[in-house]
Amino acid sequence: MERFLENAMYASRWLLAPVYFGLSLALIALALKFFQEIIHVLPNIFSMAESDLILVLLSLVDMTLVGGLLVMVMFSGYENFVSQLDISENKEKLNWLGKMDATSLKNKVAASIVAISSIHLLRVFMDAKNVPDNKLMWYVIIHLTFVLSAFVMGYLDRLTRHNH
């Protein structure tokens, strides 16, 4: 009975495979939205105010960071929790594949969230005259919470690695 339960639990990790594949579909949706924004801005580029262009560019950078986060979670999560990626030797392989454990993935995700939050906060500050003060305050508090969380996770990771 114990062996059956252990084998069933171990095999259940494959339930995550379609979830990681779903992230690739989310990446396609993000790419479509990215290019939709490019197509939308190009005809208007000469009539746009500089600040409006910067806001669009920050949105594109934001989407790019989210896309990188999706790729990182998709591949690292699959390799850490489901199975190793079997990529042939003659194909280009990302140098971090197979080297990122769950803890380093968590730290990279936290750093990415801080970067994404920073871009979002910058976009909000560029339009600060149209944002109520209490809402600005909450944006800053939420961003600082992300920063503090990422710092604490990195610090705790360093402590546990140092003690082992």
From Swiss-Prot:
It is found in: Cell membrane. Keywords: Cell membrane, Membrane, Transmembrane, Transmembrane helix. It is a multi-pass membrane protein. The chain crosses the membrane at residues 15-35, 53-73, 136-156. Its main location: membrane. It holds the Pfam family UPF0114. The keyword Secreted does not apply. GO terms for cellular component: plasma membrane. Belongs to the UPF0114 family. NCBIfam families: HI0507. This is UPF0114 protein YqhA. It comes from Escherichia coli O6:H1 (strain CFT073 / ATCC 700928 / UPEC).
